[in-house]
């Protein structure tokens, strides 16, 4: 996924040998739950080379309308509220709240953040970039953190390893 040649091929339609594991995992989740993305408005919060940019490029190649934001985008909630599918990978715990999303949105929370939690033996717990408890009643689907995108990313890494033997 990250070799310079493959990274360059990601910008052209169907030329990359591998899509990076996390974006491919996100597509697998959408496919598994029969969530249509062709023609849908996808908002990507986060533009990293690992998740945000490859995910946005692949969504564009698959005929979605894509908007890319980052955590400092002015009035970001006005943009995220337009999303049919909201993909968040910006590394800010509980950034996305219910007033950021429209009713029936599909959310893929790629974020994995540790926050202090004195009730846990290790002193922290893992949360996503979306405040799941806050948005839960408005969403159609949302991936959990932990246990959502992460395990599917690992499965894609294994798939790539086997395919490249």
Where would I find each of the regions flagged by the language model?
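Glycine-rich phosphate/diphosphate-binding loop of Rossmann-like nucleotide-binding domains
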Residues: 8-106, 110, 115, 124-125, ...
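Rossmann-fold NAD(P)-binding glycine/threonine-rich loop
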Residues: 2-10, 108-165
């Amino acid at each position: 996924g990250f070799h310079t040649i493959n990274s360059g091929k990601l910008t052209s339609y169907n030329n990359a040998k591998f899509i990076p594991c996390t974006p491919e995992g996100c597509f697998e989740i959408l496919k598994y739950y029969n969530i249509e993305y062709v023609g849908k408005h996808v908002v990507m919060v986060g533009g990293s080379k690992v998740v945000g940019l490859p995910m946005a490029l692949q969504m564009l190649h698959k005929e979605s309308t894509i908007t890319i934001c980052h955590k400092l985008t002015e009035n970001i909630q006005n943009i995220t509220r337009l999303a049919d599918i909201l993909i968040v990978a910006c590394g800010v715990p509980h950034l996305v709240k219910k007033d950021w999303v429209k009713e029936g949105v599909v959310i893929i929370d790629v974020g994995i953040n540790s926050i202090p939690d004195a009730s846990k033996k290790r002193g922290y717990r893992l949360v996503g970039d979306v405040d799941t408890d806050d948005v839960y009643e408005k969403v159609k689907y949302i991936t959990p953190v932990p246990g959502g995108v992460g395990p599917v990313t690992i499965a894609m890494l294994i798939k790539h390893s086997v395919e490249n033997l």
